Design a protein with these regions (language model features):
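C2 and C2-like phospholipid-binding beta-sandwich domains
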Residues: 31, 48-70, 81-124
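Short, flexible loop/turn segments at beta-strand junctions in immunoglobulin-like
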Residues: 23, 70-74
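Extracellular Ig-like/FN3 beta-sandwich strand-entry sites
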Residues: 75-79
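Intrinsically disordered, low-complexity PEST-like regions enriched in Ser/Thr and acidic residues
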Residues: 1-4
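Calcium-regulated, polybasic anionic-phospholipid
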Residues: 6-59, 88
Length: 124
């Protein structure tokens, strides 16, 4: 009989308040990407994108509708990264958009508090 690590599928809801306005004539058009730090077979780690929200047009306080699915593994420390960008074009390359900030935490923090609130860092 094989041992299975306890795991649950969860869906992350994301919102932000008081984002920096990077647009001149209108408000920012934010999108949030969600990544998890994954351990590779060679022992190294890399950020793997789990998904992204939709763009919320003309908003500094977006409440994103699209939920991000991920597997919560009870016995692992799963580091998460949330990055918010101001979408400025139809390009799918994030480097073509203004970076508004990021936040890192462990998935267990989100699950245990049910509503985690943290400041963004890396604002330019």
């Amino acid at each position: 009989m094989a041992f299975q690590t306890p795991c649950a599928k969860i869906f992350l809801s994301i919102k932000a308040n008081g984002l920096k306005d990077r647009d001149v004539l209108t408000r920012s058009d934010p999108i949030c990407t969600v990544s998890m730090l994954i351990k590779l077979p060679n022992g190294k780690q890399k950020w793997t994108k789990l998904g992204h929200t939709e763009v919320v047009w003309d908003s500094l306080d977006p409440e994103f509708v699209r939920k991000i699915p991920c597997d919560y593994i009870f016995e692992e420390r799963q580091k998460m990264k949330f990055e918010i960008y101001d979408v400025d074009s139809t390009s799918s390359k994030l480097s073509n958009h203004d970076f508004l900030g990021s936040m890192e935490c462990y998935l267990a923090e989100i699950v245990s508090t049910r509503s985690l609130k943290k400041e963004l860092s890396g604002l330019t």
